[in-house]
Amino acid sequence: MRIGLLIFAFFLFGPLAQGQKGVSAVSKSAIRVLIVDGFSNHDWKQTSLMVRRILEETGRFEVTVSTAPNSADSLSRTSWDPQFGEYAVVIQNCNNIQDTSLRWPRSVEQRLEAYVRGGGGLYVLHSANNAFARWLQYDTIIGLGWRSRSYGYALQLDSADRITRIPPGQGEGTNHGARFDAVIHIVNGHPINQGYPQRWRTASMELYRYARGPAENLTVLSAATDSVTGRIFPVDWVVQYGKGRVYASSMGHLWKGDVYPVSYRSIDFQTTLIRATEWLATGKVTYPVPAKFPTADATSLRAEGDMPGGPDTRSLTR
């Protein structure tokens, strides 16, 4: 009986909640996740690696990476064939803002649309909302993205969390200032943030100002006050697209040369990544909020040497 209770506690609380190191054994009921990467102005390889490690460390996820062709080579483009339907969640980690000629084949775009519309889960990871400005259904799927002043609606909140839809041509195009330790507050309760404090401080976040798009069937989960303008903008949001669930967030910045930056060591980011991915797959969240979750007064970080899955961040094969 005692052994059974210990096993149950291990799987209930997981490595992050307990501060344990090493990748947990993947359970037979693990959620299958596909990360799609291949090009970005951010370090997409290291981002995919860290996201995979954070998820697989829990023992709840089985993660695969599919790398899109990052050239115009027709053979590699036509041979790339990610099977979205084999996974409960797709994590989008491509960004072509630095070179808009880099696109997925139209057949792959259409399959992602059908996948989400039919009930698949999509996680739009940080700069992935910068991507594919010419793909109109992608804009509908993600709700808000990095777009020009002339396109789409931007959302801004007041001190009572009332949302103003700023129409095309007003306000600014999407931008951000320097990264800062932002105080995030809950705007709408949701299974992802259930059990979080009303306010908490996240480490080194890049807050997107004036993210723009159709903003249809969209619910803002949390927001933060910009350190320069004093204006309040969404941090993360969910979108219902057909039968599918979509989660997008400003959190998750990892720049070229970063290995395990404080933004990824931040316990709130890791917890939210895990809980959002579980929700996208199941519509429910069972992963616990760790005791070391940050407060409004202080960030909370895993130690620099406490790498998800072990000390060598580059040893996990892709």
Where are these regions (language model features)?
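Active-site rim elements
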Residues: 38-41, 126, 167-170, 176-181, ...
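An acidic, glycine-rich "communication" segment
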Residues: 29, 125-228, 289-318
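Extracellular ligand-binding/catalytic regions of CAZymes and related secreted enzymes
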Residues: 22-31, 46, 57, 82, ...
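Bacterial N-terminal signal peptides
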Residues: 4-15
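Short, solvent-exposed loop/turn segments at secondary-structure junctions
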Residues: 40-41, 96-97, 129-131, 198, ...
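Signal peptide processing junction and immediate N-terminal pro/mature segment
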Residues: 16-21
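Helical hinge/lid and interdomain linker segments adjacent to catalytic or ligand-binding clefts
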Residues: 22-24, 28, 32-132
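Structural detector of well-ordered beta-strand residues that form the stable sheet scaffold
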Residues: 119-123, 221, 247
